[in-house]
């Protein structure tokens, strides 16, 4: 995730905070509710003084008319169904009192609290954990917490008992019913509450198990749940939902995908920075979802329909999506944003972590300011003992309860930064001896990554790091890996983009990329530690990469100041979609060249949603705020392109799957790989070389020959001599469809092959400018 996509989010937090801070739940005053508590005063000591200071009022609990109440247990955290009731447990170090608020779904809509139960510190607190056990009717019941304690931002505390806070461990969070639609009070931050779990019928997994596909064999497809089926051309009953994705999985199966990487599906507020867009005449929203509210809760508004139990519906439909994907041999990886939350900076809304224990969950500077390594206002304190346990519990939950197969960690380098050392010795100016580790300092053996890597449950899942952050930490090739972490290889993207467009000086670096980047992944790591990609949600789509030299982000409402400026793109001679026929032909050729480079490289290829048919966002390389055509998969366009680029992509993915040599478990050696230039076995690695070719021994195909000519000049290539065999064309990106891929079932295949024969009889091949080829060995038949 690029920091720029969040840049506007905390510009609006000041405005939203006013709305949110006034949006509290009034206490019930109706005559049929009798007072629940009898107040008594207590006092607590200030951390910097021995004098007692009366800072809170704790109410002595009485019996509830609705629920049987007992002490409860401090573990596990969150709500847990047991003994015909629910145990609630929440960690809060610095609070002095806690109240659990129970809210019926109907009362939530009316801004009411149904019942409040004050917890007794002598019975309902163990260490720093508040807990209580309740038995009663929890049908359609929600909950939240009030905490009291110091409100002292300069000390890192934001306690305010007027706020009802979300449980960090909540399994489902309820707010608005419909995606992107304001409630009757026009509040962008509506009241939220956590679903109380009940002992319902167990989900039928039908024996579903994790697929555990070898990572070297993966072809990953990065996608957005809502964007995948929201467009009307999807022609499904519930567009923009988990169910919609499940219905369209056969498209991915047809393409050859065996792993989907879901952009954030944790609960987030899509109206976080809701504002009118004067350019498009619609509203800016948080479409991508990189601003989490609840890490255990699936995004509720991705459910197929709202109902009294649409939280449960969302959980079940996410499970159905995973189950249906597994039936088709497709793994599911979640993009998790464990680097910051939606609570923004010091002026942001307070709805969970900040009110529960701000100084624990966030990296704070000595005077309470938020460190902003995420670029989104705050930074999750990942290596604090409590927070890293939270992260571990969260990941375990999604693996064991939701059956996901792995995680991609957004801005994963933040997990390698040191945690806040929040105590008087280093924060409040007390004299200390020696140097202290500055909060956020990169550390070589981060405890949270160590825990994840060696956890017995998580050890077998896919772990992918976006190995950089917005604070300048760039760890591609150097992320703490324990031998199991893969990385989004941003260097692969940049090198391949520059070589394919014909930039001098990249032939050697391009060759490294083709081999799986062994220059980066050393120390026992494998090619599959590199997640190779040309395009992702950040940046240009593949079609825009060959159409625009410059970003076109005016529609984002930030005067084109957001988004990446260094895209290494090339418009092929004319800027924008309206171009000459010759330019459009070259663009299609370049798209094919990029896809060939992705499919013949060692490592794990990743494709961005829509690139398989040439989706365009009109040159916008930062579409985080658009719930419209820019981010919607166009099923009608996919059908139009079915015999063109989609066919090309499908055939190349199938070819990669068939070739044993294109998904190696180890980096290729000279026994298998041979480099060539315009003449066999004479590669040219000079600064001006724009030609790279190699042959690869393959146990299935015997041998394959791949060449890239990124020069503006055509050339004649001499091929390696293989006695008894002839090279035959399989892919030539300079040819129009369907002759760009000569498959056995291609009509007029023999006619097409004859066009090459006189060249191949001479063991040469004519390559046009900006083209790539794949040749296969075929035995010469006796006349």
From Swiss-Prot:
Pathway: Glycan biosynthesis; starch biosynthesis
Phenotype when the gene is knocked out: Strong reduction of the starch level in leaves, but 50-fold increase of water-soluble polysaccharides. No alteration of the amylase-to-amylopectin ratio. Absence of starch granules in the hypocotyl endodermis associated with reduced hypocotyl negative gravitropism but normal phototropism, and presence of some starch granules in the root columella, leading to axillary branches with wider branch angles.
CDD domains registered for this protein in UniProt: AmyAc_Glg_debranch, E_set_GDE_Isoamylase_N
GO MF annotations in UniProt: isoamylase activity
EC number: 3.2.1.68
Disulphide bridges: none
Catalysis performed (reactions): Hydrolysis of (1->6)-alpha-D-glucosidic branch linkages in glycogen, amylopectin and their beta-limit dextrins
Transit peptide, from-to: 1-43
Marked site: Transition state stabilizer: 538
Localization per Swiss-Prot or TrEMBL: Plastid, Chloroplast
Description of how the protein assembles with itself and partners: Associates with ISA2 to form the heteromultimeric complex Iso1 required for amylopectin synthesis.
Record-given protein name: Isoamylase 1, chloroplastic
Source organism (scientific name): Arabidopsis thaliana (Mouse-ear cress)
Organism placement in taxonomy: Eukaryota, Viridiplantae, Streptophyta, Embryophyta, Tracheophyta
């Amino acid at each position: 995730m690029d920091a720029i996509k969040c840049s506007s989010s905390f510009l609006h937090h000041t405005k939203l905070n006013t709305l949110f801070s006034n949006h509290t739940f009034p206490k019930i005053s109706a005559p049929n509710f009798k007072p629940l508590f009898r107040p008594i005063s207590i006092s607590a000591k200030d951390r910097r003084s021995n004098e007692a200071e009366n800072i809170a009022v704790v109410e002595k609990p009485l019996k509830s008319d609705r629920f049987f109440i007992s002490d409860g247990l401090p573990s596990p955290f969150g709500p847990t169904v047991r003994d015909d009731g629910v145990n609630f447990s929440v960690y809060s170090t610095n609070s002095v009192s806690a109240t659990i608020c129970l809210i019926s779904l109907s009362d939530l809509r009316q801004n009411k609290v149904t019942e409040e139960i004050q917890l007794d510190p002598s019975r309902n607190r163990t260490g720093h954990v508040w807990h209580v056990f309740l038995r009663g009717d929890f049908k359609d019941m929600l909950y939240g917490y009030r905490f009291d304690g110091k409100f002292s931002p300069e000390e890192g505390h934001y306690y305010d008992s007027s706020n009802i806070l979300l449980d960090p461990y909540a399994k489902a969070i309820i707010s608005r019913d419909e995606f992107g639609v304001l409630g009757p009070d026009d509040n962008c931050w509506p009241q939220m509450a956590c679903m109380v779990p009940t002992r319902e019928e167990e989900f039928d997994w039908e024996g579903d198990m994790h697929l555990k596909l070898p990572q070297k064999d993966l072809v990953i497809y990065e996608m957005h749940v809502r964007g995948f089926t929201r467009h009307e051309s999807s022609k499904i009953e519930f567009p923009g939902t988990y169910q919609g994705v499940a219905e369209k999985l056969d498209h991915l199966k047809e393409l050859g995908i065996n792993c989907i990487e879901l952009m954030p599906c944790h609960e987030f507020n899509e109206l976080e920075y809701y504002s009118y867009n004067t350019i498009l005449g619609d509203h800016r929203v948080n479409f991508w979802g990189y601003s989490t509210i609840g890490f255990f809760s699936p995004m509720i508004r991705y459910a197929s329909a709202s109902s009294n139990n649409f939280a449960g519906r969302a959980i079940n439909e996410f499970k159905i999506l995973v189950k249906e994907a597994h039936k088709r041999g497709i793994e599911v990886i979640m993009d998790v944003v464990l680097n910051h939350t939606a609570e923004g900076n010091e002026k942001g809304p307070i709805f969970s972590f900040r009110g529960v224990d701000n100084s624990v969950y966030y990296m704070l500077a000595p005077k309470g300011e938020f460190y902003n390594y995420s670029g989104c206002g705050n930074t999750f304190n990942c290596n604090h003992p409590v927070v890293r346990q939270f992260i571990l519990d969260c990941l375990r939950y999604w693996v064991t309860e939701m059956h996901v197969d792995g995680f991609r960690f957004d801005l994963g380098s933040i997990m390698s930064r040191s945690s806040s050392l929040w105590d008087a010795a280093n924060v409040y100016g007390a004299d200390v001896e020696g140097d202290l580790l500055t909060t956020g300092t990169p550390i070589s053996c981060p405890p949270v990554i160590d825990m994840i890597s060696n956890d017995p449950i998580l050890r077998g899942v896919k772990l992918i790091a976006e190995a950089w952050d917005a604070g300048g930490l760039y760890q591609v090739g150097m992320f703490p890996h324990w031998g199991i972490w893969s990385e989004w290889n941003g260097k692969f993207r940049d090198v391949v983009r520059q070589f394919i467009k014909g930039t001098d000086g990249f032939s050697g670096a391009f060759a490294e990329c083709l081999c799986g980047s062994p220059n980066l992944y050393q120390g026992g790591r494998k090619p599959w530690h590199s997640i190779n990609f040309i395009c992702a949600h950040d940046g240009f789509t593949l079609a825009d990469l060959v159409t625009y030299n410059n970003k076109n982000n005016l529609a984002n409402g930030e005067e084109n100041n957001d988004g990446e400026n260094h895209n290494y793109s090339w418009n092929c001679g004319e800027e924008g979609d309206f171009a000459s026929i010759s330019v459009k032909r070259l663009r299609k050729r370049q798209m094919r060249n990029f896809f060939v480079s992705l499919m013949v490289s060692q490592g794990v290829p990743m494709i961005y949603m829509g690139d398989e048919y040439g989706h365009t966002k009109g040159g916008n390389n930062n579409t985080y705020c658009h719930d419209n055509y820019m981010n919607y998969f166009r099923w009608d366009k996919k059908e139009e392109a079915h015999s063109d680029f989609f066919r090309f992509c499908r055939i190349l993915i199938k070819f990669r799957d068939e070739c044993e040599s294109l998904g190696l478990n180890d980096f290729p050696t000279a026994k298998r790989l041979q480099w060539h230039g315009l003449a066999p076995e004479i590669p040219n690695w000079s600064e001006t070389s724009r030609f790279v070719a190699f042959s690869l021994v393959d146990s299935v195909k015997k041998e394959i020959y791949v060449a890239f000519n990124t020069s503006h000049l055509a050339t004649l290539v001499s091929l390696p001599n293989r006695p008894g065999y002839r090279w035959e064309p399989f892919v030539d990106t300079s040819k129009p469809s369907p002759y760009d891929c000569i498959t056995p079932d291609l009509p007029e295949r023999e006619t097409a092959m004859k066009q090459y024969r006189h060249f191949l009889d001479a063991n040469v091949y004519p390559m046009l400018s900006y083209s790539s080829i794949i040749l296969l060995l075929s035995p010469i038949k006796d006349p």
